[in-house]
């Protein structure tokens, strides 16, 4: 450790956000760049822990103290080598991960944690800027072929690992471009898509083949996959959204978040001039208080919504870590995202009872009621009903598992009791040679878990194809975040 007193002498400073009145007029990323000297001081706050609990918070097993120290010393090339040793895509996690490593940071027991996420992101951006992110093509090919179905973070991680191991890998994606939720689910103001494209370019040069616009299960059947490939990795995600079947659900103007967000991204990239779901001048209500709801909020603001209200059935979290969620667990606290900084009209402890129409089949308002948690369930507070006028409702209430698609039926893979694709300790499904990685097997989770799943599943596939593997396997299928 280069600065033994850094955590005591240097205060925690996170990157500043661009002014609200400026950033809501464009789709560019929210955060402003910082000087490298500032970054070095932040890296110097990493203390000489006996046991670095930040490792506990990250399923990738990132070597956090090592690359923190290297960045403090200015050894950027060695820092990116240590970072890439455990994480294929630090430019994604450095932007999109909620950083459970920071809530597990030892400094965070009684001080402000090290800005690990900020240091990670700057490490990879310095490497790209200096031309130090190069293709790592295999020395030889094994003659084995692998199909990866789905091009989100789990699928891309599995594909890159298997390609580098010498297998011939094809990644299939039903959307018109590769990237999965990274492409069309994550708004441009959180991650500009050229960030994704430059990594895909590296993967193509390594030998990974991309097949966008292919609906596997229809255009390419499960039988076709079995005949053409020696192994298949299902990385189709948890895309079956949770719905709200209440009176008025059929009214026009009610959409799932993932029906809205892709069009926002296409608009941001200039791929469409007038998206079919456009909230300019309209009143919007978002159901769900999580990250996806915040993404709908930021997108609605940039489209020019007249008002946006976000509803959450849970009570407002506390500002400080609850006593029942001690360090090093990830606490449920009140957070203000960049979108909430732009327009924060959140309502907690409320439930939607009915969608109200205008008599012409269009949405005009929603009927809500205050709730309280009693007898193990949420109960309505009598006399607390009210209406919120709105033209659009976006449901951002999470996902229940992978879609029960024709591909799953064709491959005859079994599902577990939660509706996810069943798998063994080697990430293999109930059908030999068919593996599953990411949310399709785990259930909806964080991007770091998706990448860890992709890396671990790749190791299992490599072992299945060759009888051995040197690929790292950071997690088991049954591993879960530390909870209380």
Q: Residues of each region from the PLM?
A:
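Beta1-alpha1 glycine-rich phosphate/pyrophosphate-binding loop at the start
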Residues: 5-32, 61-73, 78-83, 109, ...
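A conserved FAD-binding loop/helix module that cradles the flavin
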Residues: 293-298, 303, 440-471
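Ferredoxin-type iron-sulfur electron-transfer modules in oxidoreductases and energy-metabolism complexes
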Residues: 23-42, 63-95, 99, 110-140, ...
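Short cysteine clusters
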Residues: 46-49, 54, 58, 93-97, ...
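Glycine-rich Rossmann-fold phosphate-binding loop(s) that bind the pyrophosphate
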Residues: 149-153, 288-290, 439
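FAD-site-proximal beta/loop scaffold in flavoenzymes
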Residues: 250-281, 374-444
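Feature captures the FAD/FMN-dependent oxidoreductase FAD-binding
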Residues: 78, 140, 145-149, 197-246, ...
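C-terminal catalytic lobe of FAD-dependent flavoproteins
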Residues: 23-37, 41-45, 356, 360-414, ...
């Amino acid at each position: 450790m280069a600065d033994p007193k850094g955590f005591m002498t240097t205060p925690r400073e996170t990157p500043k956000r661009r002014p609200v009145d400026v950033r809501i007029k464009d789709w560019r990323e929210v955060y402003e760049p910082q000087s490298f000297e500032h970054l070095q001081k932040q890296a110097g706050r990493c203390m000489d822990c006996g046991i670095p609990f930040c490792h506990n918070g990250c399923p990738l097993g990132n070597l956090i103290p090592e690359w923190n120290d290297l960045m403090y010393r200015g050894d950027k090339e060695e820092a990116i080598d240590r970072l890439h040793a455990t994480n294929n895509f630090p430019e994604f996690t450095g932007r999109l991960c909620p950083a459970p490593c920071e809530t597990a940071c030892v400094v965070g027991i009684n001080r402000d944690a090290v800005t690990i996420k900020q240091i990670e992101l700057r490490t990879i951006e310095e490497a790209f800027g200096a031309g130090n992110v190069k293709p790592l093509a295999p020395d030889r090919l094994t003659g084995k072929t692998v199909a990866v179905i789905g091009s989100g973070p789990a699928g891309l991680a599995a594909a890159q690992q298997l390609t580098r191991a010498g297998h011939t890998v094809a990644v299939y994606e039903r959307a018109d471009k590769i990237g999965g939720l990274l492409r069309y689910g994550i708004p441009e103001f959180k991650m500009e898509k050229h960030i994704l494209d430059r990594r895909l370019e590296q993967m193509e040069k390594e030998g990974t083949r991309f097949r966008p616009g292919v609906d596997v299960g229809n255009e390419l059947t499960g039988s076709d996959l079995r005949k053409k490939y020696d192994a298949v990795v299902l990385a189709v995600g948890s895309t079956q959204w949770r719905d709200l079947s209440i009176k008025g659900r059929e009214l026009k103007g009610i959409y799932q978040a993932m029906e809205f967000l892709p069009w926002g991204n296409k608009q941001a990239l200039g791929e469409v001039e007038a998206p079919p779901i456009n909230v300019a001048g309209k009143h919007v209500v978002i159901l769900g208080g999580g990250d996806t709801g915040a993404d709908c909020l930021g997108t609605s603001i940039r489209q020019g919504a007249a008002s946006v209200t976000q509803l959450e059935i849970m009570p407002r979290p506390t500002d400080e870590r609850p006593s029942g969620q001690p360090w090093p667990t990830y606490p449920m606290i009140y957070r203000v995202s960049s979108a909430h900084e732009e327009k924060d009209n959140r309502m907690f402890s409320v439930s939607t009872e009915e969608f109200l129409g205008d008599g012409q089949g269009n949405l005009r308002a929603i009927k809500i009621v205050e709730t309280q948690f009693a007898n193990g369930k949420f109960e309505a507070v009598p006399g607390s009903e009210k209406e919120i006028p709105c033209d659009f409702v976006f449901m951002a209430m999470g996902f229940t598992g992978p879609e029960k698609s024709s591909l799953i039926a064709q491959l005859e893979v079994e599902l577990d009791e939660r509706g996810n694709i069943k798998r063994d300790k080697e990430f293999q499904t109930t059908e030999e040679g068919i593996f599953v990685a990411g949310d399709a097997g785990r259930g909806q989770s964080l991007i770091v878990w998706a990448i860890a799943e992709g890396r671990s599943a790749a190791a299992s596939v490599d072992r299945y194809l060759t009888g051995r593997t040197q690929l790292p396997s950071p997690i088991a299928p049954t591993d879960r975040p530390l909870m209380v």
